[in-house]
Structures are given as C-alpha cells and as structure tokens.
C-alpha cells in the first residue's frame, strides 16, 4: 500500500472518503497504470495450454511457420483472465488475407466479429512492419479464458474492448508478429539466394 501511495503521489494517511473528484480521477488512473500488483490466481481458469494450441494449429493448417504464446494471468474489474494466441503462415493456408479465429472459454465465436476486441487489435496492427503485405496466407487464433468474459451482447459473440484485455492481446500479438517477421526475413533471404544461384547457373556457361 505504501509503495502504491508513493507511485500515485498520495500521502498514505490520505483517506478515500476525503478525496475530491480530481483526486479520485487521479487515483483511478494510477490504479490502471500500476504494474506491481500481485498477479491474480489463475488456478480457477482452464486455458487450452500452449502445447495443445500449437498441436491443434499444426494439425489443422500444416503451416510453414507457427508460433503460439500463453500470457500470464491478468485481471479486469477483479476478474482473472488469460490470453492465448497462435499465428500460422503458409502451408495449406489460402492466400485470401488474414483470417482470425476467436475463442472464449474454449467456445468458438462465429458472429459479430467486426466489433470484437480481437479484430480491433489485429486491424490496428501495422503488418507492413513485419514484412506482411497484400493478402497473405495468415491465420491468427485467439483464446480468451476468464471467469467472466466481457461480452458486448447477450448473444455472447463478441468481446468488449476492455483496456486490460486489449493490452494483453496486443502484447501477445506483438510477440508472435516479431517471430513471424524473423521467419519472413529468413524466407526472403533464402529466395534471394535461390534467384542468384539460378542466375549463376544460367550465365556461367556463357562466360
């Protein structure tokens, strides 16, 4: 408590009941930005697990590149959650642009994807930074595991863009995108080397 009070620049003896509106706003902002709170207990959650997600994506997509990540437990409004995500490129994936598969507590979300927080994070990503252009053969699988998924509607088909969820989704996608970028760079180098070799094979007999 003392450490947080120092971070928020409040005196430890300052009571919440005596705070004015401006101080309450300042306290709320500090609570949202403070990173040293204890992580929530994830024992009540049932994530897929990185290994199971990787095996499932490998079997279904047979990609040239595959990476998965499971983020540590976080919380929004006191409800714990875990973000799991996988990204796959090439192989049997068709070249029709980025395809996103969304799951929440192991249940696929099939409708109303346009206003979903996962789609928002994917669409806000500058894919050209990761050497992805045009309509790539790229698949993203996202799983939100929580004691209370913040659905936008009673139909439970899209997830609200809570800041805590959005932050964890962005960090998961950033981690995977960097790995994909490394793969694409190596792929480009290999293709360039192959072109050079073909040129040498073509013109060396003429020298």
Predicted regions, residues:
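Helix-hairpin-helix
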Residues: 1-8
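GHKL/Bergerat-fold ATPase module in large chromosome/replication-associated machines
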Residues: 12-14, 20-134
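Charged regulatory segments coupled to nucleotide-binding catalytic modules in large multidomain enzymes
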Residues: 20, 24, 88-207
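Extended hydrophobic-aromatic, low-complexity segments
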Residues: 2, 13-14, 150-154
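Short helix/strand-bridging catalytic loops that position acidic/His residues to coordinate divalent metals
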Residues: 9-14, 156-160
């Amino acid at each position: 408590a003392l450490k947080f009070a120092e971070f928020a620049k409040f005196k430890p003896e300052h009571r919440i009941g005596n705070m004015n509106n401006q101080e309450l706003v300042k306290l709320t902002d500090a609570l949202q930005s403070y990173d040293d709170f204890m992580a929530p207990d994830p024992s009540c959650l049932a994530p897929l697990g990185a290994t199971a997600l990787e095996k499932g994506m490998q079997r279904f997509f047979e990609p040239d590149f595959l990476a998965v990540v499971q983020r540590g437990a976080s919380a929004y409004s006191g409800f714990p959650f875990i973000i799991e995500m996988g990204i796959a490129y090439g192989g049997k994936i068709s070249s029709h642009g980025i395809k996103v598969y969304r799951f929440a507590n192991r249940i696929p979300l099939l409708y109303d994807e346009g206003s979903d927080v996962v789609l928002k994070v994917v669409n806000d990503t500058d894919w050209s930074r990761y050497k992805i252009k045009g309509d790539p053969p790229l698949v993203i699988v996202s799983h939100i595991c929580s004691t209370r998924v913040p659905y936008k509607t009673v139909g439970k088909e899209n997830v609200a863009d809570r800041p805590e969820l959005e932050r964890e989704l962005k960090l998961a996608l950033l981690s995977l995108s960097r790995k994909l970028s490394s793969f694409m760079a190596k792929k480009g180098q290999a293709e360039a080397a192959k072109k050079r070799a073909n040129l040498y094979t073509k013109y060396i007999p003429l020298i």
